[in-house]
Regions:
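Short beta-strand-centered segments that line the small-molecule binding cleft or hinge
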Residues: 138
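Bacterial N-terminal signal peptides that target proteins for export
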Residues: 1-8
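Sec/Tat signal peptide C-region and signal peptidase I cleavage site
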Residues: 17-23
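Bacterial N-terminal signal peptides
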Residues: 9-17
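Amphipathic alpha-helical segments
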Residues: 24-131, 148-155
């Protein structure tokens, strides 16, 4: 009976060791930190801010023009024209905003995948879901994105 228990304990320990060897390695990334330190993202958001300011300036200019129109019919026609033009401009801005956001996100995700592969990390999560453990890949992802390098060398 003692040998059976010893054999079972030995088998259990061996099985736990095998499970530990096959366990996924976990890394995490602080997405907001990566995004705020990623030069392409900074430039994309500056471009979007400039476009937004252009939209605001367009509306202010049209408002000034509107105040100078005296005829009710001309005012109505002007309003309709401005509404159509603004809708086109706003739609283009929205498309550009979506395109830039998607491009930034795809670049960050692809960089995280590349860094994880280089560091032999199986799973990458957002830092907010990790309470303890794991490998922080944030700086490596930022380095990869800004320098077109594989990953930052360990310190």
């Amino acid at each position: 009976m003692k040998r059976f228990k010893l054999a079972m304990i030995t088998a259990l320990v061996a099985a736990m060791g095998a499970l530990a060897a096959n366990a996924d390695t976990i890394g995490y990334v602080n997405y907001k930190t990566v995004e705020s330190n990623y030069e392409f993202a900074k430039n994309a958001y500056k471009e979007l801010d400039a476009e937004y300011l252009n939209l605001q300036q367009y509306l202010m200019d049209k408002e000034k023009q509107y105040k100078n129109i005296e005829s009710p019919i001309q005012r109505k026609n002007f309003e309709e024209t401005v509404q159509k033009d603004f809708k086109v401009k706003n739609d283009n801005f929205t498309k550009l905003k979506m395109k830039k956001a998607e491009e930034v996100e795809n670049n960050i995700v692809n960089a995280a995948k590349a860094v994880a592969a280089e560091k032999k990390i199986d799973v990458v999560l957002d830092y907010r879901v990790i309470f303890t453990g794991g490998t922080d890949l944030t700086d490596d992802v930022i380095y990869y994105l800004n320098n077109n390098k594989k990953f930052k060398k360990n310190k």
